[in-house]
Curated annotation (Swiss-Prot):
Glycosylation sites: N167, N172
Role this protein plays: Apical membrane anion-exchanger with wide epithelial distribution that plays a role as a component of the pH buffering system for maintaining acid-base homeostasis. Acts as a versatile DIDS-sensitive inorganic and organic anion transporter that mediates the uptake of monovalent anions like chloride, bicarbonate, formate and hydroxyl ion and divalent anions like sulfate and oxalate. Functions in multiple exchange modes involving pairs of these anions, which include chloride-bicarbonate, chloride-oxalate, oxalate-formate, oxalate-sulfate and chloride-formate exchange.
Molecular function via GO: bicarbonate transmembrane transporter activity; chloride channel activity; chloride transmembrane transporter activity; chloride:bicarbonate antiporter activity; efflux transmembrane transporter activity; formate transmembrane transporter activity; identical protein binding; oxalate transmembrane transporter activity
Protein known as: Solute carrier family 26 member 6
A Gene Ontology cellular-component term: apical plasma membrane
Gene Ontology BP terms: angiotensin-activated signaling pathway; bicarbonate transport; cellular response to cAMP; cellular response to fructose stimulus; cellular response to type II interferon; chloride transmembrane transport; chloride transport; epithelial fluid transport
Keyword terms, alphabetized: Anion exchange, Antiport, Cell membrane, Chloride, Chloride channel, Cytoplasmic vesicle, Endoplasmic reticulum, Glycoprotein, Ion channel, Ion transport, Membrane, Microsome, Phosphoprotein, Transferase, Transmembrane, Transmembrane helix, Transport
Documented effect of changing N167Q: Reduced chloride oxalate exchanger activity
Oligomeric form and interacting partners: Interacts (via C-terminal domain) with PDZK1 (via C-terminal PDZ domain); the interaction induces chloride and oxalate exchange transport. Interacts with CFTR and SLC26A3. Interacts with AHCYL1; the interaction increases SLC26A6 activity.
Notes on how activity is controlled: Oxalate transport activity is inhibited by 4,4'-diisothiocyanatostilbene-2,2'-disulfonic acid (DIDS).
Native source organism of the sequence: Homo sapiens
Amino acid sequence: MGLADASGPRDTQALLSATQAMDLRRRDYHMERPLLNQEHLEELGRWGSAPRTHQWRTWLQCSRARAYALLLQHLPVLVWLPRYPVRDWLLGDLLSGLSVAIMQLPQGLAYALLAGLPPVFGLYSSFYPVFIYFLFGTSRHISVGTFAVMSVMVGSVTESLAPQALNDSMINETARDAARVQVASTLSVLVGLFQVGLGLIHFGFVVTYLSEPLVRGYTTAAAVQVFVSQLKYVFGLHLSSHSGPLSLIYTVLEVCWKLPQSKVGTVVTAAVAGVVLVVVKLLNDKLQQQLPMPIPGELLTLIGATGISYGMGLKHRFEVDVVGNIPAGLVPPVAPNTQLFSKLVGSAFTIAVVGFAIAISLGKIFALRHGYRVDSNQELVALGLSNLIGGIFQCFPVSCSMSRSLVQESTGGNSQVAGAISSLFILLIIVKLGELFHDLPKAVLAAIIIVNLKGMLRQLSDMRSLWKANRADLLIWLVTFTATILLNLDLGLVVAVIFSLLLVVVRTQMPHYSVLGQVPDTDIYRDVAEYSEAKEVRGVKVFRSSATVYFANAEFYSDALKQRCGVDVDFLISQKKKLLKKQEQLKLKQLQKEEKLRKQAASPKGASVSINVNTSLEDMRSNNVEDCKMMQVSSGDKMEDATANGQEDSKAPDGSTLKALGLPQPDFHSLILDLGALSFVDTVCLKSLKNIFHDFREIEVEVYMAACHSPVVSQLEAGHFFDASITKKHLFASVHDAVTFALQHPRPVPDSPVSVTRL
């Protein structure tokens, strides 16, 4: 009984669901309205141009309220900090800030090495920019600071402008490091200027040109670049400096060539550190629900490796390279070297765009997850100020880290108070504890970097998913990845963006063209090739393109239209013109002979003359022109015969029609262009539409348009598209309106057709 009772409600529910589905299918709606062309629609809806909003007037207003609003807009901390719920959020932000700081310390040291700078400058870059973002940022969860992709981009610039000496024994490390710090800090200032400038002019949409496949392909290639750049620290090798295209290939070849020179102590140190880091990360993933915060594997590895290196003397006994001197305290601000701007402007713009793209993509992910809004333009300003002010204090360009951002969110972080706490912890290390890491092996920092690349290297699996989902996106991913690997990071991004934009143009050149048919008993029209029940309306051809028509695809649109209609329009027009020309020539010849006949009839002799008027009878028969009769003309009755012949010609049907000329006629009398996909029209599109009207009217097919949006109609008017031959009565509110009108008004053969000039 219990089982039966339990199954009863389920059966009842299933029956109700089926009944509701049937009711929904049977539920239809009936609506009666007149056919609406554009003229009637404008009258009915009282259409008028939308009023222009003068946003610039608002921007240029000068008032106390406007100044206060601008202050709150560009300094968001004044908005959210007074409302900060201390009891609910402070504990989570404190724990999150400490967790992020524990990650910031080893990553800052390691990523400075990746940028070709002394490790302490990674700590500076983990303090100043983070605190500046706390004041100006709008994302509550991203962790700003050093990041592998940004660091390797900076490293490629510093190594190209301040390279190693050709003879390693002649290296002046102090002078080299000072030059690289100057290059990196100047680069950071220039990156900040670009980002602030773009943010102030509301240019945050620039990141929309970097699609997700492009960004993921780029970061994956950058991860490969980072991995290769750390091999010299893992194996303890001294490599030559390579920059420019194919530098990655040259570096890999040199590593393979010098692999026998590897230092065993360095390799063992890196391997042990890597194994420890991997094990700790696996434990964190497995015990994520049980642990209040992740095990700080990087910090523990850092402390343990430093202690072992100091106790065992790894530098002297096994020639393991160590970090060396880390000065305590902060450095004074330094003005950027403006003479380097011309050399850095290209790299600075690339780094600015990439850094912003990474930050805004992560920021939007967390904002969507937690239900708040991120202002892309203010994010540009915040990142720009972080890099600008950070560069003055000798930091290198930063962005946000995915791994640290995830930790900041997962450990209870609710606001950028967590970022401020982490920056204060880094400040404590800079001032008091930095010198304790003097004996930290560089191989350990390299291991930390390589292990943290796991997430980005996993993006190689994108190729499989993109192959199944969208092969055009896969092509973007592959081109971006390959170009970045071969041409380096700056040129790789340029090639990727250009290719992505070209692919967009190519895809608009080859949209999906379809002939539409009516779904039975509805006013819905679908592609007859996809919907088996959709049938073409007899006598009417409905054509649609899935993309807007503009200069790049207007010719393709016209060609596809003529092909899908099943009529060789150009051939019919050319044959019609040839036959009409021949007909005119025959008529002219006949008139000339009649004139000659009249002259002979008016001669004084008055003799009866037998004349064959039509000497080209066979020619006229072969061209389907009405046969001319052989006639006997005398001087007495010639004018009466000519009058009779003229009356017969006036009653004859129009000889210019396809039927009269013996040419095949289209099996439809009306063509409807579904223009619902058009978002704009240019002059080339206007000319193409005009030519379509002209060509199809030449073969006795009337053309109508349907489903144009109001902005498109306005652009048609501005382009003087409508005239005496093409009016708004040819434009209908929907495809069904146009089809119904075409069926009610099949185009008759006109006595004097309205001509449309072909453009």
